[in-house]
Amino acid sequence: RGGSKRIPRKNIKTFNGKPIIAYSIEAALASSCFDKVIVSTDDEEISEVAKDFGAEVPFIRPVEISNDFAATNPVISHAVDWMENQGNLINHVCCLYATAPFIDPNSISNAYKKFKDMKADFCFSVTSFPFPIQRAIKINKSGKVGLFQPEHFHSRSQDLEETYHDAGNFTGERSRHLILIFQYYLRW
């Protein structure tokens, strides 16, 4: 999307010598996991940059899924529907975010292999929290602090279970499970 408010033109801002979107496109191409690397955008300049780095941009994203409130799911569904209407059979879909410059091809390949081996319906990238969340602190309305899990006040960090959060690099799914994305997040 070309209309980011927080960081204008973020998808094509230069990061370490090239547009930030280039890193995701190059990683996708180098992973050898995809028959096609497609960029969905509403912006002509982003489209040109994406093509320059080897992606296809076969359509312009409709305005109704190109605003500040557009979620990822309808964007992916639109791309899949468009591809299928062109006669393509889509079994698996990966949404690699344009602003994921640190994603590497091996991470994509390994995730895809695990996705297939486990016969999963959905996958996404995760990273561990740098500090045990069991020792997280909350601040109430009067400014007082307390632990979310007071029972871990004296626990050694190395004794606590490692926890993870969405790394924001990619999601992958079987194409007809797109509408269930958020249900999967809630089932973990």
Where are these regions (language model features)?
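Conserved SAM-binding loop
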Residues: K13-T14, I38-V39, C95
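Short internal beta-strands
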Residues: A22, V37-T41, S125
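Short phosphate-binding loop-to-helix
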Residues: E45-C94, F102-N106, N110
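Conserved core of the sugar-phosphate nucleotidyltransferase
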Residues: P74, H78, P101-R187
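N-terminal nucleotide-binding beta1-loop-alpha1 segment
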Residues: R1-P8
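Short, structured coil segments at secondary-structure junctions
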Residues: C33, F53-A55, K141
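A short, N-terminal amphipathic alpha-helix
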Residues: I20-K36, E48
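Short, high-confidence coil segments that cap the C-terminus of an alpha-helix
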Residues: F34, N88-I90, K119-A120
